[in-house]
Amino acid sequence: CALAADYAARGHEVTLIKTSHSLHDDNFSHLCATGGRMRIHEFGTDTACVIAHLSRDVADVRGKDIVLLCTQTGYHPDVLRRVVPFLTPGQILLMIPGYLSTAYALGLHLADGVILAEAESNFIDGRIGAPGEFQVGFRNVRNPIGVYPHNALPAAREVLDRLGTPFVYLKSVAEAALHNPNMIVHTVGAVMSIPRIEATHGDFCMYHEAFTPSTWNLLEVLDGEKMRVLEHLGCDPVP
């Protein structure tokens, strides 16, 4: 919802498609009731946004220049099975974050000429404070993405740069997937916090509690292993 509202505020015609009735369904219902109106609160600045179109029909991805897939990565296979049949040559499917879900899309008989792109991480971090109200935590000033096939990069770049997001284009979607920091941060933080999570019955905030010096040491070692994998793949091991 936040990305849809943000791009709408930048002047893009946006269609927000909700593919389930689970997370943030109350916010989507609010948007439907108010004509797509949402406010973004960002460090003392309030921006009123109007999302042009709201839908629960995945067929509405047809004809869109860019299709952004923003659902949780665990649901990528299911959502892609529903979306891919409606994609046509020239469209760009941008998965945020990607986590190498390009592999799922390619296994679904994707139409020739559809361009796939994977973002390393979300462009905007924040929380929905109330229906129709989004509080920005931070914006990434550098947003790495990979494009598949690689020879489609010039055409994809021409379209994606119109969004106004500060993109950095990587060598491959694999590089974008491996560079996602959550692969390391969430794994170490969650595993090392299991006793604390159980003791508090889930009343726990990983970013505030998990990363003691010993846990951070483990994170650094595992991240170093990942960097060596990136080097062997011919990618840039950006820390």
Q: Where do the model's predicted regions map?
A:
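Rossmann-like NAD(P)(H) cofactor-binding subdomain of soluble oxidoreductases
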Residues: 68-69, 73-134
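NAD(P)+-binding Rossmann beta1-loop-alpha1 motif at the extreme N-terminus of oxidoreductases
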Residues: 1-40
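Short acidic low-complexity segments
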Residues: 41-63
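Short, well-ordered alpha-helix to beta-strand connector turns
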Residues: 11, 51-52, 64-65, 90
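Short, conserved charged micro-motifs
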Residues: 150-158
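C-terminal substrate-binding/catalytic lobe of Rossmann-fold NAD(P)-dependent dehydrogenases
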Residues: 177-239
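Hydrophobic anchor at the start of a short beta-strand
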Residues: 14-17, 114, 167
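Short beta-strand and adjoining strand-loop segment in the mid-core
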Residues: 131-151
